[in-house]
Amino acid sequence: MTVQKAPVTGPHLLLVDDDRLVLTTTAQALNGVGYHTTTAESVEDAENWLAQGHSRPDLVVLDVQMPGGSGLTLAQRLRELDHIPFMMLSAYSDAETVAYATQQGALAYAVKPIDIAQLIPTIQTALSRANELQELRANRQQLQKALDNERDISMAVGIIMVQHRLKRAAAFDLLRQSARKQRCKLIDLAHSTIQAVETINL
């Protein structure tokens, strides 16, 4: 089996389905409305393609049941690979399967046979949710970085307080003035201050 790629246009979709006819017709229809699609006929094909370091797809659309590997297994792998967003396709619409797919992080669930007219808005909704989640993760990372920087600056100030027997405000001013003189960022000087103490204590 091979992985096929359509010309680059809009959002990048990785389609994974063992039914070649469904895969081809779905890809052609999505290409026709501006999506860029890559197709894989098995979980193994999809995993190999992802392992080759290709550009991160905006959304993976995968079948639940496929010979040689479950789409749900691939879904777990996608979560490990930088939270690659995905939605599920299945001939089954039972509540248990839908609930399990949702628990695994599926952003949408569509039932076969595929109706392209219904699939397109489902994909659009999944892409919108994926963008929202990405923004939330980015904001959380920025917040965590800010908290980490604040902690490290506070540690550096504490070191200066001990070394120079200064109060906190005076120690912070000294750290800030030193950063200006050395033309470096406050956080970089804080890291250097902490590292110097850690080196001495080795």
Where are these regions (language model features)?
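Conserved acidic segment of CheY-like receiver
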Residues: 7-22, 26-30, 60
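Short amphipathic alpha-helix used as the core "switch/output" element in two-component signaling
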Residues: 47-48, 72-83
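Acidic, metal-coordinating helix/loop segments flanking the phosphotransfer/catalytic sites
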Residues: 39-59
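Acidic catalytic/metal-coordinating carboxylates
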Residues: 41-42, 68-73
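Active-site residues of response regulator receiver
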Residues: 62-63, 90
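C-terminal output helix
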Residues: 96, 114-123
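C-terminal output/effector regions of signal-responsive regulators
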Residues: 131-132, 138-202
